[in-house]
Design a protein with these regions (language model features):
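N-terminal low-complexity, intrinsically disordered tails enriched in Ser/Pro/Gly
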Residues: 2-6, 129
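A short, aromatic/hydrophobic, helix- or strand-capping loop or linear motif
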Residues: 73
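Beta-strand-rich domains and repeat architectures in extracellular enzymes and scaffolds
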Residues: 76-77
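Boundary at the C-terminal end of the N-terminal hydrophobic targeting segment
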Residues: 16-20
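Bacterial N-terminal signal peptides
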Residues: 5-13
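SH3-family beta-barrel domains
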Residues: 21-69, 80-84, 91-94, 101-134, ...
């Protein structure tokens, strides 16, 4: 059986196979270590604007999105995200602005129109194996490199596995290998 190794360069539009450049990483936030993987779903409260639960996951709609210090264009840009589909957590709402948090714990404000409800994930830690069935003994479909982004198709609340797709490959990935879904969360 052949294994496909998906690398970040293959997922970026226009990236040459022979030329792989690391993506910029947001600056480290002093006095705030990167969050540890969650073991329980967070307590949720209704958003003040939409009434939808907070926190909740969304994804970046465009390949260039400014993260601002506050909810408005008068606030300075602190960072520019350059990866469409990147999963983020919406942690607060104000008018048409959403305070988001990325996998590294960096927070800031973006316009709601720059976010999509599409559920995506980011492979965290080391390489992760995409399996044909939700079982460690199932055949491998692909090896996913750290930082690869994919789409969450569904997650059963009681399952340690989620059905996902990445660059045309479809299979099952353990929740602990991805960032973009809460422990015990059901995604349909």
């Amino acid at each position: 059986m052949s294994r496909i190794v998906l690398v970040l360069a293959l997922l970026l539009p226009g990236a040459a196979a022979a030329e792989t450049r690391p993506l910029p990483v947001p600056p480290a936030v002093p006095d705030r270590p990167a969050p540890a993987p969650m073991t329980e779903p967070p307590a949720q409260t209704p958003g003040t604007v939409t009434g939808r639960p907070l926190p909740r996951f969304a994804s970046l709609r465009a390949s260039e999105i400014n993260l601002r210090a506050g909810p408005g264009t008068r606030f300075p840009v602190e960072w520019t995200y350059t990866r469409a589909g990147l999963p983020v957590e919406i942690v607060r709402e104000f008018d048409t602005w959403r305070r988001i948090r990325d996998m590294d714990g960096v927070e800031g404000w973006v316009q709601q129109a720059r976010l999509a409800p599409r559920r995506t994930f980011l492979v965290r830690g080391g390489a992760a194996t995409l399996r044909r069935a939700p079982d460690e003994g199932a055949a491998a479909v692909a090896e996913l490199a750290p930082g690869v982004i994919g789409t969450i198709r569904r997650c059963e609340a009681a399952s340690a596995w989620c059905e996902v797709s990445v660059a045309g490959a479809r299979g099952f990935l353990r929740r602990e290998a991805m960032w973009g879904v809460y422990p015990g969360e059901e995604v349909r």
